[in-house]
Amino acid sequence: SPAVLEEHHDAQNRMRKTTDQSRYCQPGAPSGFIALGERRWAVEPDGWHAARDHSWGLYAERRPLSPDSKWLPPKAPVGPQRSLRFWIIFRSEPFSGFYHLHEDSEGVRRQFDDVFGTPLGGAITRGWSGESFAIADARHSAEYHPGTKVLKNVEMTLTDARGGVWTQLFETAGPPWLGQTSGYYPGGWKDGGNVHTYHGSEELALEWDEFDFSRQPLLHDGYKTEDGHFDGFGRGEVKGQPVQGNVYLCSVRTTTPHGDVHWGAAHVEHYYNGPYRPYGFE
């Protein structure tokens, strides 16, 4: 289906913009192959799911290029803080789409002055040229693996702008992916850098390693990280303390307002910044 453009993200701190960014998100049906050494996998649309997003503008700061916070004054208070984040790209043909939602620690959706400030946005679309249904309201009921914040499943109840009610059940296919392994967070590369830093080549830099993330949360400190240089997106991660991934591959069952049921797959990003009392997380 066509890409969905998120509402523009804008945040300020001490009269300076800290976020000024646009992003589009899009589901897809991939075809081709994946090769690793002598192994090769055929990629066909009926068995694989694709999701992509692209952003441009001023985004979240990342170490080691951002200033060390010890040299800066504390961030100014900005009111209620974001806790819960769901960011979902799905395909359950003939319907596909994208939506995201953010809530505070009491489960209230509101505008936040941060990098992911939008309360709710997105759309469900029938194919490339079919109808598009803007999402006007969303409710969720999530289940987690005992004693963790690792998602097991979540049911979303969505109301579109025309009053139609959709339900989607997402069930995780395995443990979440850790973005640290892509170099997205501080210390993701062996030199201590990240995706924004130079690694010895302006054309292509390659490195590899092996980790076991089958059980989460777990200890994973990255490479050459220092205290205060480890956290990503203000999630409260502390070096030497367990962490977990935040990106899930899920099956999805979509039920339309007319009762039709369609199955597919989804990319679900989900995590918490601090406590979230509706689910008992402190």
Where are these regions (language model features)?
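Structured soluble/peripheral alpha/beta segments that form catalytic or ligand/cofactor-binding pockets
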Residues: S1-E282
